[in-house]
Amino acid sequence: MSMKSYKARGIVLHTLKYGDSGMVVYLLTDSGGRQSYMVQGVRSARGHGSKLALFQLMFAVEFEGLESSRMQMHRFREVRSGIVLQSLPFDVRKSTIALFMAEVLYRLVKECEPNQRLFDFVWGSVAALDALDEGVANFHLWF
């Protein structure tokens, strides 16, 4: 089985529990539109909590992925934070807005074709929401 490696950026739109310790992560990526990734061992008791933290909704990640010609689902070789978020994970208002944004994008974006303008807009929106001090309550209207 031939595996092709590639580097990309993505934004977490949705996650699903898979088995005892795995999960399926749906990302909006810069190079391939909406794609699904299998992550094994992320929810096990062996201390992968830091990896699990990367897959919160609307978190921006940079990663090296593996694509197989036989599988529709991709895998991660390496994942790291794409934007260091200062307030989004800790502010309930911002987290709620991020949840809403992720749900809207997950339901609306179905294509697997790259859409660089949409990706850049969403990536910038995550950074803007994290940096915002005032007007947070109306951010979803702007989005």
Where are these regions (language model features)?
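Non-catalytic alpha-helical scaffolds and adjoining flexible linkers that form interface surfaces
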Residues: 1-143
